[in-house]
Amino acid sequence: MSVGLPGPHSLPSSEEASNSGNASSMPAVFHPENYSCLQGSATEMLCTEAASPRPSSEDLPLQGSPDSSTSPKQKLSSPEADKGPEEEENKVLARKQKMRTVFSQAQLCALKDRFQKQKYLSLQQMQELSSILNLSYKQVKTWFQNQRMKCKRWQKNQWLKTSNGLIQKGSAPVEYPSIHCSYPQGYLVNASGSLSMWGSQTWTNPTWSSQTWTNPTWNNQTWTNPTWSSQAWTAQSWNGQPWNAAPLHNFGEDFLQPYVQLQQNFSASDLEVNLEATRESHAHFSTPQALELFLNYSVTPPGEI
């Protein structure tokens, strides 16, 4: 089938187009030549569409779709995700609300008594004890386990306390109260108990350095003793004295009676003689040589002179 191309004579002129625009009310009458032109233009359009491919989705202009990087992320809320934390909270509450076994006083006494005798029970023994105390096997088993743990914890704490006490006692410095008390103040005593700095110790005692060897009792002593002055040193008095070896515990009035009788037998002349002898002895003993002789005599026994 051959399609004839329309020639230049078939195109309408501008005047005809204007006339056709003005006469819009009149129906357009197409001639057979015009039909052939329409068919040719339709075939050309089909060919161009087949030659040029359709634009792909990539070539199409993007519409206002939200960017995944800039747009806020939408969290998918599912009923399973919502139930997760609620179920966990319920489990925690169920664990906290677990009822603890409340033992009576009689049950506790029986359990403690049995624990002191035997800390580990067999299956049969636990069943017998649970039946006696109206408890379950699990309750008795749990109580014994907890009691053993408490006992071990208590033993561990006691061991730590005793070990710490021994360490503190071993590290404490040793004190010597007897040494500190026996030595006078001013001496430095080492931990070993020995005196320090013997060479630098000055052996000057203020009490000894300031001591004056003048005793007021000795200076003011009057060597006039009534017993010495009234004593008659005659052989008669010594001969008349009975030399009885009386025990020391009987030293009393019996021993003093002859001495009193001897004083009563003195006469006036004897008294004058004794007074003169006393004055002479006082003058003699007032000298330092006599004082030194008297001191030496008082210190040494009579048999060693």
UniProtKB/Swiss-Prot annotation:
Changing residue 125 to A: Decreased protein expression. No effect on protein stability. Residues 96-155 are annotated as: Sufficient for interaction with SALL4. GO terms for molecular function: chromatin binding; DNA binding; DNA-binding transcription activator activity, RNA polymerase II-specific; DNA-binding transcription factor activity; DNA-binding transcription repressor activity, RNA polymerase II-specific; identical protein binding; lysine-acetylated histone binding; RNA polymerase II cis-regulatory region sequence-specific DNA binding. Residues 198-247 are annotated as: 10 X repeats starting with a Trp in each unit. Residues 13-25 have a biased composition (Low complexity). Belongs to the Nanog homeobox family. 'Nanog' is derived from 'Tir nan Og' the mythologic Celtic land of the ever young. Interacts with SMAD1. Interacts with SALL4. Interacts with ZNF281/ZFP281. Interacts with PCGF1. Interacts with ESRRB; reciprocally modulates their transcriptional activities. Interacts with NSD2. This is Homeobox protein NANOG. It comes from Mus musculus (Mouse). The lineage of its organism: Eukaryota, Metazoa, Chordata, Craniata, Vertebrata.
